[in-house]
Structure formats: structure tokens, C-alpha cells
A protein has these predicted regions:
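Glycine/charged-rich beta-loop-alpha catalytic/anionic-binding loops adjacent to active sites
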Residues: 45-56
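Extracellular/periplasmic catalytic domains that process cell-envelope and extracellular macromolecules
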Residues: 13-16, 25-28, 81-84, 118-120, ...
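Acidic/histidine-rich catalytic neighborhood of metal-dependent amide-processing enzymes
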Residues: 54-150, 174, 178-179
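Structural recognition of the beta-strand scaffold that forms the well-ordered cores
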Residues: 21-23, 31-35, 59, 88-91, ...
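Solvent-exposed loop/turn segments at secondary-structure junctions
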Residues: 6-9, 26-28, 38-42, 94-98, ...
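Sec/Tat-exported extracytoplasmic proteins
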Residues: 24, 42, 74-81, 91-93, ...
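A non-catalytic alpha/beta surface segment that caps or lines the substrate-entry region
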Residues: 1-27
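Active-site-adjacent substrate-binding region
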Residues: 3, 7, 124, 133-196
């Protein structure tokens, strides 16, 4: 558990961000990281109904879906521990606190984590976000391709080989998600699997 006390990005108060890190096969020098944010937006500023824009969102897809994947992986890794590589599962807070047009107020938990990444550091990271839509589409996110092209190509090729057409071999949007901040502040190549 990693707590970081910060100033709220828009209010005159302090808040505590809490990140959770689970590490498997800690002795392995070669590590990979999978990450997801567990927080949800404090307000539904993109809601189609203006009356709902000051209400918090439930976060079943944006928040809980990536966490569900990581918790499932945690169960698998507990039963079948990795032998040749280390695996880190990072659950970050404060991803969704920003406002449109203010990119440095997003990914706050990842920004805090990136300042103190424990050794041994992962060789790359995979961020999982918004993966629970009934009609999933995972195009290649633009920052992912810039930061970690080999990882993108490997994951999308593997998904194609395994018969997952949701991983679309086309360019998607540039999304300033946690992977962006992990690379920006810790220089860990990171990709984003996101339906956005």
C-alpha cells in the first residue's frame, strides 16, 4: 500500500491517494507490470443529461473493469506463480480527477508512483482501462505505439493469433491514461488497452 497526500486539483483541501502494488516472483530481474485505476470520476461531466453532470459516476466500466481483470490475474498468479518472470499488479488512485483541457490533473496516482518505482523495475507495463463494454473495440492507442511499439505489436499479434477480433489493427485515439504518465515520469514503456 502506497499513500500519497496531495492538494486536491481543484479544491482547497488535501486528499490522500492510495495505490496498491502486488508483486509476484520478487527475485526475478525481468518484470512486467499490469495496471488499472480503481477510482471513479467525482462528477459525470460528460453525461448527456446536464442535470447529472455534478453527480459521481458508478464506474462499472471506467474504473471497475480494469480492476476486475487484475483481480482475476491475482487469483491465477497465486495458484500458478510465474517462474521465469516477475509480475507486478498496480492498482492506482486518482486517475480520473482531471478536467478536459487540464491533462496534468489526470493520472495523479501514477504520477506519485512514478516518483518512487520500487526495484527491480518492470521492463514494460500494460494499462487496462474501460474493457467491459458489450461491444469491445481495442484499436491501437497512439501514445502506446510511440512509447512501446514492440509491446503493442506483440500483444495485438498474439490477440489476433488467439482469435480476439476486438484487438483491431488500426490507429485509435491518443488517450492520456495512466500509461502515458508512467512513461512520462518513470520512463517505463507502457501501453493502454482501452475501448475509448
Amino acid at each position: 500500500i502506497m499513500d500519497e497526500k496531495i492538494s486536491h486539483p481543484y479544491e482547497r483541501r488535501y486528499i490522500t491517494l492510495t495505490n496498491y502494488l502486488a508483486r509476484y516472483n520478487l527475485d526475478a530481474a525481468y518484470r512486467i507490470m499490469l495496471m488499472a485505476h480503481w477510482d471513479t470520476r467525482e462528477f459525470a461531466d460528460q453525461d448527456l443529461n446536464p442535470e447529472n453532470r455534478f453527480l459521481p459516476i458508478l464506474g462499472a466500466n471506467d474504473g471497475a473493469s480494469g480492476v476486475s481483470v487484475l483481480l482475476t490475474l491475482a487469483e491465477i498468479l497465486h495458484t500458478l506463480p510465474p517462474l521465469n518472470i516477475g509480475v507486478d499488479l498496480l492498482f492506482v488512485d486518482g486517475e480520473d480527477m482531471g478536467k478536459t483541457g487540464d491533462p496534468e490533473k489526470f493520472g495523479l496516482g501514477t504520477q506519485a508512483f512514478a516518483k518512487n518505482v520500487p526495484e527491480p523495475r518492470p521492463q514494460f507495463a500494460i494499462c487496462i482501462d474501460m474493457v467491459a463494454d458489450q461491444e469491445q473495440h481495442f484499436p491501437i492507442e497512439q501514445f502506446s505505439l510511440q512509447q512501446a511499439p514492440e509491446v503493442v505489436h506483440s500483444i495485438w499479434l498474439l490477440a489476433n493469433d488467439l482469435g480476439f477480433p476486438q484487438f483491431e489493427n488500426r490507429m485509435g485515439n491518443a488517450v492520456m491514461d495512466d500509461h502515458y504518465y508512467l512513461y512520462k515520469y518513470a520512463k517505463i514503456p507502457a501501453i493502454d488497452i482501452i475501448d475509448f
